[in-house]
C-alpha cells in the first residue's frame, strides 16, 4: 500500500513524489551518485538500484517488442560501453542493462535517444511497456496485426503527464488471436483480437477485453470485461 491506514500520514515515498518527478541526470553525474529521493524518482526513468553498491539497472522500453536493425546495434553499443557487454531480455519485451554507474547514466540515456530508444516509464507507478504477440506481424493465425495498436497505445500513454503517478504500475497487452501468446490474462488489461460478421456478411475485427490479471504476491487470472 502507498498510504498508511492512518490517513493523516503519507508515506515517505508519496511525499517525495508529491514534490515532483523531475530528475536531472546531468546533476547526478556531477555529484557521482543518486541521493535518497533521486533513487526513488529514477524508477520513473527506467533506472533501478542494485544490491551491489554503486551499480544500477536500466530498462529500455520497446512497445510491442520490435526494434529496427539500427536500434539493435545501438543496444549492443550501449551494453558494451556501459553495461559490461551484457543485456537481459524481459518477459514483457524490454531490454535491461546491468552494472551501470551513476555518473554514466546521463550519457547512456543520450546514446539510446540517438536511435529513438528510451527508458522512460520503464519502472515506477506508471503505464509500463505495452506488450504484443511476439509474432504479431507474421503469425498465420492472427485476426489482425496488433503491433500498431501496441505502439500507438504506448505513444499516447507516455505523452499523458497526468498518468505519471498512478497508485501502482499498470500493464497492457495486445494479442492477435485467442491463443493469447502475448499473455493477456496476466496483465491489467488484455486485448485479444476477434472477428465477427457484420450485417452485410463481412468480417469485422475487434477486441475481447479482459482485466485484472497479474502475477504478484497473489496471482489473478484476468476476467472478461466485454467483447
Where are these regions (language model features)?
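Small-residue-enriched alpha-helical segments and adjacent helix-cap loops
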Residues: 26-34, 50, 55-204
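Charge-rich, low-complexity segments
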Residues: 1-45, 184
Amino acid at each position: 500500500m502507498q498510504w498508511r491506514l492512518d490517513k493523516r500520514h503519507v508515506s515517505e515515498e508519496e511525499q517525495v513524489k508529491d514534490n515532483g518527478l523531475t530528475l536531472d541526470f546531468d546533476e547526478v553525474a556531477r555529484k557521482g551518485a543518486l541521493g535518497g529521493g533521486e533513487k526513488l524518482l529514477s524508477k520513473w526513468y527506467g533506472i533501478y538500484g542494485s544490491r551491489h553498491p554503486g551499480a544500477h539497472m536500466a530498462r529500455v522500453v520497446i512497445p510491442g517488442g520490435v526494434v529496427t536493425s539500427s536500434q539493435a546495434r545501438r543496444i549492443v553499443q550501449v551494453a558494451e560501453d556501459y553495461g559490461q557487454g551484457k543485456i537481459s531480455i524481459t518477459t514483457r519485451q524490454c531490454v535491461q542493462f546491468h552494472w551501470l554507474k551513476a555518473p554514466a547514466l546521463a550519457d547512456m540515456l543520450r546514446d539510446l535517444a540517438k536511435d529513438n530508444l528510451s527508458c522512460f516509464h520503464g519502472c515506477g507507478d506508471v503505464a509500463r511497456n505495452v506488450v504484443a504477440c511476439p509474432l504479431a506481424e507474421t503469425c498465420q493465425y492472427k485476426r489482425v496485426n496488433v503491433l500498431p495498436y501496441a505502439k500507438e497505445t504506448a505513444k499516447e500513454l507516455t505523452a499523458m503527464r497526468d498518468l505519471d503517478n498512478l497508485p501502482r504500475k499498470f500493464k497492457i497487452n495486445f494479442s492477435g488471436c485467442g491463443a493469447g501468446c502475448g499473455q493477456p490474462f496476466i496483465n491489467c488489461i488484455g486485448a485479444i483480437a476477434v472477428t465477427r460478421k457484420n450485417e452485410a456478411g463481412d468480417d469485422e475485427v475487434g477486441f475481447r477485453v479482459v482485466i485484472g490479471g497479474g502475477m504478484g504476491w497473489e496471482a489473478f487470472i484476468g476476467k472478461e470485461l466485454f467483447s
